[in-house]
Every structure is written in C-alpha cells, then in structure tokens.
Curated annotation (Swiss-Prot):
GO biological process, one term: regulation of dendrite development
Connected disease: Oocyte/zygote/embryo maturation arrest 14: An autosomal recessive female infertility disorder characterized by oocyte maturation arrest, fertilization failure, and/or early embryonic arrest.
Species this protein is from: Homo sapiens (Human)
Effect the entry attributes to changing residue 211 to T: In OZEMA14; uncertain significance
N6-acetyllysine PTM positions: 66
Modified residue annotations for Phosphothreonine: 70, 106, 157
SMART domains: WD40
Residues that bear Phosphoserine: 41, 72, 92, 153, 161
GO CC term (a single one): spindle
Sample GO molecular function, one term: ubiquitin ligase activator activity
WD repeats: 182-221, 224-263, 266-303, 307-346, 353-395, 397-438, 441-480
Outcome after substituting residue 72 to A: Loss of BUB1-mediated phosphorylation and inhibition and partially defective spindle-assembly checkpoint
Major subcellular location class: cytoplasm
Full protein name: Cell division cycle protein 20 homolog
Amino acid sequence: MAQFAFESDLHSLLQLDAPIPNAPPARWQRKAKEAAGPAPSPMRAANRSHSAGRTPGRTPGKSSSKVQTTPSKPGGDRYIPHRSAAQMEVASFLLSKENQPENSQTPTKKEHQKAWALNLNGFDVEEAKILRLSGKPQNAPEGYQNRLKVLYSQKATPGSSRKTCRYIPSLPDRILDAPEIRNDYYLNLVDWSSGNVLAVALDNSVYLWSASSGDILQLLQMEQPGEYISSVAWIKEGNYLAVGTSSAEVQLWDVQQQKRLRNMTSHSARVGSLSWNSYILSSGSRSGHIHHHDVRVAEHHVATLSGHSQEVCGLRWAPDGRHLASGGNDNLVNVWPSAPGEGGWVPLQTFTQHQGAVKAVAWCPWQSNVLATGGGTSDRHIRIWNVCSGACLSAVDAHSQVCSILWSPHYKELISGHGFAQNQLVIWKYPTMAKVAELKGHTSRVLSLTMSPDGATVASAAADETLRLWRCFELDPARRREREKASAAKSSLIHQGIR
C-alpha cells in the first residue's frame, strides 16, 4: 500500500499539465483581474472625489481615433529671427550710428565710402537690413565671394535664375586683310565708332570700314616719306576722328566731309595713345608727357601731365569722365583727376606692381572706380584695381604678353589680347577671373582690341596683318528683347521730358 502511494505521488510530480502553485499568473488571468477592478483604497477614493467636480473633456467612453500631429506652419504668436540671416556686425554698426551726430560730408567723400563698402562687403551698408523676415539666407551678389560661403550655399538657386554656359564661337565671324600694319607694341591702331565704323591705321594711311554696309574708304595718307600713323581715336558721338602721327602731330578729321579740321602740335615725339573726354582730347607721347587739348579753342593745349619717364602707351578716360588712367613703358600706372588740385596736376594713385610695360588699360563700365591693367612680356599679369582705395582687388598670371583689355557689360566679363606663344584672345569672368574661353587663330601677336558699339563683336588687329571679328558677346534673343524694351522706355521718357 505504501508502494502504491509513493508511485502515485511520483506520477503527479512528473505530470507537466498540472498547475504550478507558485508560478506568476498568466496573461489572461491578469486581464480578468484588472477588468474586475481592485478594491478601492482610501487614497484612490479621495482622488476620485476631488476630480468629480470637473467638466469632462470629451464624451465618456468615446475613444479618440484622431492622432495629433505637428502643425505644418508655426502658430505665429512671436517672431524669433534666425541668427544665420542676421548680419550682426552691420546691425551693431547701424544701431550705434543712430546715437552719433551726423558729420557733414561732401558728396565726393560719400560716394567714395559707398564704393569702398560695395567692393569690400559686396553690398551697400546704408541699405543693409538688420533682420530679415525669413529664415532663408539671402542670395549673394553676383560674383561675390567671402569666407562664409556656407550661408549662401544653404539656399538652392531657383531654376529660372540658374546660369547655363553660353555658346562662344571659337572661329572668327570675319577676317579682313590689314597689309602693312606696324608690328609695334606701343601703338594703338584700331578704334570702333558709335556709328559702327571701324578705323584702322595701316602704316602711313587710315582706312575706314563700315560694318553695316561693308564699304571701305581711305581717309588720309601721310605726305612725307617715312612718316606713319601711330594712334587713332573716335570721339564719343562718332563723327570726328583724332589721329596721332610719328611726327608728333595730333590731327582732327571730319569723317562725313573727309576733311582735316585742324592740326595740333605740342608734343616733341610721336603720339602713341589718344583718349576723348567730351571736348577734351588727351594725347600720350613717347616723351612721357600727356597733353590735354581743348578742341573748341584756338589755344588748344590747356594742360601737361608729367608722370612717366618713358613712352605713354596706354591712355583711357573713365566712362564718367572723372579719372584718366595712363600706362607707360616705365611699368607705371597713374590715375589722374579731371581737374588740377592744389598742388597742380598730380596723380591720385600710382601703381608700381607691374614688372613690364603697361599698354592694356580699361575702365569697368558698371563700376567707375574699378580699373583693369595688363603688363608686357616681363610681367604677363592682369591686375584689377580700386582707384579710390588704391587696393589691388585681384591679379592673374596670363602666361603671355598682355596687349589689350576690354570689358563686356552684357556678361560682366573681360577679354584680353596676348602675344607669344599662342597669340590668343582670352575671356575672363569678373570678379573671380576664371578663364571662360580662349579664341585662337592669329599666327602672330595681337596688337590691339576694340569693341563694336552694340558690345557683341570684338575686333583684333595682329602682327600677322589680319583683322579678325569675333562675335563672342552676342546677346541671346531674350536678353536682346529686354535691352530693346529698356532703351525704348528710356527714349520715351526723354521725349516726354523735352516736351
């Protein structure tokens, strides 16, 4: 009997389906116990009695199936500016400036300060915004670079404003013969008038080529043997042509009448450079002197500028007529005022960084205080200057002699003509001075460049006795229509003002 009881106990212990007395309750047991609810404790009863007076937030027993999401737009209860879009230094300057008394400044000084701010900061400080009503960073000005590039890269450029590479023909549009053109680096032998007439000096003669009709006319020929034409320059209106000669003369010709109006003699050596400023004609000589001629009066010689020790081969008046830039064989670049100061005719700036003769001199059409210069074989550099501060904004090694520089207002670019070894024309993007394109075709060094009145075509005269026309700045149809509309609106306003 005892053996049977032992076997029965052992069998019951070995059964796996029997309930375990000390095991935790199963899930269904816990759910059933929670549904039945525990006995109310004194603390819970007190809590229920305290909250019984509140109005229920929603219908009892109704579960909310709507999931609360973050609103897509801010509530708009307050404005918190983004620090990345706030120019804190400019804001501090503008706020502190309000408490300072205004100093009486001349218009010239104010304009100089505005030009400095534009070149150093990329924007005018007086027109800067302290805080912006948007968290997106503002677009940088075209071509402007600074160390905080990340602020400008956060905003994607709109598709409509993205620039695509334009097509630049690698071959000239037309090639003209230029026999007996003088292979002299220091002369300026071509110029394009506002009437679309190209003047070319070939040894002792001056020829006129009409780009509209294709007609060619010989304007003049030197009478004495051994004499030659050393420079030509059109007046802004395009009806008079100034001619410099190897015999130290400056002649003034009426192109319509094909008649010489006057012969001005004041230099002691050949006149290799000419530049107009309204009725003032400036001429640079091999002696290193620059003469101002008032073509309206009999006593034409009104001023002499002495700032070079060797030949003046580059001479350009600024578009606004306030400054005259001169480059010489003494490696100097001088910037002269339009009127003498207290000390007489003294250069405002003198740049000495070039290591070779400076013939290429060109003013920026849209920034009157920016000047581009290029050096000869010993220098081979293109430099951009701020003539107000005297700072060199940029310098690029062109790897060859720089013979001429022109600005393109359509595309904010420069084009330069070069000598040995490739004799090419190079287009540069301003102000980064990145190389855009190279135009090759000349077999000898480029001597001079000039631009058509519409700014689309560049003519290059070279020592290979050819004159090549490059349509490298032609506007696309959309931009051409915009410019035509703007010019038409401007002319209509002028007519209304005249009435």
